[in-house]
């Protein structure tokens, strides 16, 4: 027997007096397959290579800017 995970979504509309509550149940294997499908799409093939390159470039610039700011305050003349 698979474990069931449930979710409750509550939304309230400003213009009307009705509240909407929806409940869904999703098994852990369905949720895992959804995440696996997304990760395979984003981490493999040409799109995966592009994501890794963009992530590396973004990480480089973050470290560069933090180092520049740190160096500015460390070597600042008083």
Swiss-Prot record:
Residues 1-22 are annotated as: Disordered. It comes from the Eukaryota. The keyword S-adenosyl-L-methionine does not apply. Residues 1-48 are cytoplasmic. GO terms for molecular function: protein homodimerization activity. The chain crosses the membrane at residues 49-69. Residues 11-21 have a biased composition (Basic and acidic residues). It is a single-pass type II membrane protein. The modification N-acetylmethionine is found at residue 1. Pfam families: DUF4731. Keywords: Acetylation, Cell membrane, Disulfide bond, Membrane, Phosphoprotein, Signal-anchor, Transmembrane, Transmembrane helix. The modification Phosphoserine is found at residues 6, 17, 22, 27. Residues 70-78 are extracellular. It is found in: Cell membrane. GO terms for cellular component: cell surface; plasma membrane. Homooligomer; disulfide-linked. Regulator of red blood cell formation. PANTHER family: SMALL INTEGRAL MEMBRANE PROTEIN 1 (PTHR38503:SF1). Belongs to the SMIM1 family. This is Small integral membrane protein 1. It comes from Mus musculus (Mouse).
